Regions:
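Short S/T/G/P-rich N-terminal loop/turn motif that feeds into the first structured element of a domain
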Residues: 14-102, 114-134
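Outer-membrane beta-barrel domain signature
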Residues: 102-109
Length: 134
């Protein structure tokens, strides 16, 4: 259920009047911090990835960091990360560029040093209502 809510919420950021019913690809990660790592490490990682994204040709994606306020399984994850893409094709292009580059590969290696992720899923999400003006 947590993943479903994360996926739905992340997809909202791609919606506009013309694409409200187009499915978006959303990748979700549920993670715990590795020993000695914490939110400051993630904040630095986000700074680095945002700088890298400025250089990407395929940078049409949104990143969302989720910190649980209440979940049924309190030990499941320290954070969730969602990466929302406009389509599966957009996801493939972005990931091919990211993982195919030295900088992207180094950023992913750093990500794995910070987090231990127990779950990774890709969902197709279709927005059915936009009430928050996002």
């Amino acid at each position: 259920l947590l993943t479903l809510l994360l996926v739905f919420s992340s997809a909202l950021t791609f919606a506009d009047d013309h694409a409200a019913n187009e499915p978006a690809a959303v990748e979700t990660w549920l993670c715990t911090f590795n020993e000695g790592k914490g939110m400051a490490d993630m904040d630095k990682w986000f700074d680095d990835i945002n700088e890298y994204a400025k250089t990407q040709t395929n940078n049409k994606y949104n990143l969302h960091l989720w910190v649980p306020n209440f979940v049924s399984d309190l030990k499941r994850a320290d954070i969730a990360l969602t990466v929302a893409f406009p389509s599966l094709a957009g996801m493939a292009a972005s990931q091919e560029e990211f993982f195919g580059s030295k900088v992207g590969s180094a950023l992913f290696e750093e990500y794995q040093e910070i987090l231990d992720c127990s779950s990774r899923e890709v969902w197709m999400v279709t927005q059915k209502r936009m009430g928050m003006g996002m």
